[in-house]
Design a protein with these regions (language model features):
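First exposed extracellular module after export/assembly in secreted or surface-exposed proteins
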Residues: 1-121
Length: 121
């Protein structure tokens, strides 16, 4: 399987929430595959939540099947959305990971630069 994302914005302001749409592309014998997702906040500070506002906990995993809004209509390409809200004025870097019950893991790093809304003179 592979993990990818829809277009991501490059900058985020403090307090701003951005959408991260993920694609889980499956191939081979995936009929009995079960997945879990987690993330690690490498740089900056912020919160990751699902489409119902439930926060994911940094460095903990959650079953992907329990993700609200998980689109399983196409069994080969599952789609789900998470939201990131920056709570600091620093650059944010997050590493998302999905692993299956066969021991395989895929990672994707997401980076947002800070957006300076006021220019100091």
């Amino acid at each position: 399987f592979s993990l990818s994302s829809w277009y991501l914005q490059k900058q985020v302001a403090t307090g701003e929430t951005v959408e991260i749409r993920f694609y889980l592309d499956r191939e081979g014998d995936y009929e009995k595959a079960e997945y879990e997702i987690g993330y690690i906040q490498i740089e900056g500070k912020g919160e990751v939540s699902d489409s119902e506002g439930m926060k994911l906990v940094n460095r903990e995993v959650r079953p992907l099947a329990e993700m609200p809004g998980l689109d399983t209509e196409n069994p080969v390409k599952q789609v789900f959305t998470l939201f990131y809200r920056s709570t600091s004025a620093k650059r944010s870097e997050l590493k998302f990971f999905v692993r299956d019950n066969f021991g395989r893991e895929r990672e994707m790093t997401v980076t947002f630069d800070t957006e300076n809304s006021a220019v100091k003179e």
